[in-house]
Amino acid sequence: MSPVVAVVSKRRKQLKHLAPIDAQQRLVQLWLHDKPASTRERYTRFATAFTAHLGGVGKTISQTTVEDLVEFSEVLYQRNLKEPTINTYMAAVRSLLSFAYKTGYIQFNPGAAIKLKKLDQRLHEKVLNETDIALMIRLTERTEYRYKALKVRDVLILKLLYVAGMRISELVGLRWKDFTPRDRTGQVTVVGKGNKTRHILLPEYLWVEMMEYRGDAGECDYVFPSRNGKNKPLNRQNVDPIIKDAAERAGLSEKVSCHWLRHSHATHNAERGTPVPLIQQTMGHADLATTTQYIHIRPGDSSAMHLPRV
């Protein structure tokens, strides 16, 4: 028996003798088990919303139909959620149902019949130019803070999100043990989506700044700890205001978020001719096509530019 089959068989046995509601709760726990902490937090919220919807019509996951999924999607629309958010909810529910099917908890997978909507990504609207990013960082450096350490922290958060192209969940989860020296610089080990690990070599100037910021912090200490406790990471909800404040200082839109810096990392590298596989590796994209889209969002030329004036 292969390891995968053994795991599925074990999980099926764990669910078999439980009452319907207990089995449903255990199913969700097993589904969440191997996911990163940030994903577990969001997926728990999505699963709770879905099972509450089913409970409202007297059903459990084992009785789910395609019609239930359509109705749940409509409920999300009625809550005035944006389409990308609804897509995220439905993707999580499909993942849960797929897991339920693989473990034998359900006999057929209604989620397989549901297609997620294709969204207009408009990545070009979420890319800052290099001057804007430099301005965000420089003006933050010149801003008066009550505590100097908080200013240094905010500047390094801006730099890591942009220079290393990190996701916000990856940034807040960093511990000092993830930083490894290499010659005059060093690398940081990042655990991304799907618990996939990647290594990012940092430029020398950023490595030096990170080590100066570290001080006497221990290996297991969070790089950006919560002010409510040293053994807790900075909450991701507390990072967005740092980015928005920096954008406001630079006279940019209030819509600027952490992910804009990641988008900008990919776009600026593509425009500078950085090899696409290297960008993919640094950003942790599972599919090269995800990285390739950044090459085309701000073209330097097009066939339209080569036609005569009409």
Model-derived regions, located:
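Conserved catalytic core of the tyrosine transesterase superfamily
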Residues: 1-310
